[in-house]
Amino acid sequence: MKRFLVIGLVAAAALVGARAYAHHSFAATYLEDQTVQIEGDLVQFLFRNPHSFVHLNVKEKDGTVVRYAVEWGGAGQLQGLGVTRETLKIGDHVIITGSPGRNPKDHRVRMVTLLRPKDGYNFGRRPGEVVD
């Protein structure tokens, strides 16, 4: 009986670990070896766990306006870096660089840097990174 209990616990732990790994596999959603830059006006800021999102209206080269979803860190992680739910406001004009989504039609980006030109606020995902 103990043997079955141990086998069951090991199997459950393996499944939970696999699920956590899959959840944090950004490579499944984003092209991490590529970088794009988007510029637009903030229409929504979801400051939450496990991931925050910034939504922007971006004017494409052909003049159409497209809404982009930009994935950011979780609220707890961002607070430790000085970001709060008050950091960004609807209407803020921002420039974001990051990894593009695998499906271009999804208009997704995983944020690396953010710059708000009106006051020079900047955020870099990598330690010590400053946005020009």
Stretches with model-predicted labels:
Residues A20-V36:
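Short boundary/loop segments of OB/S1/cold-shock single-stranded nucleic-acid-binding domains
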Residues G40-L42:
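Conserved hydrophobic positions within beta-strands
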Residues W72-G80:
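Short, structured beta-strand/loop micro-motifs enriched in basic residues and often containing a Trp
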Residues G101-G128:
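OB-fold/S1-family single-stranded nucleic acid-binding modules
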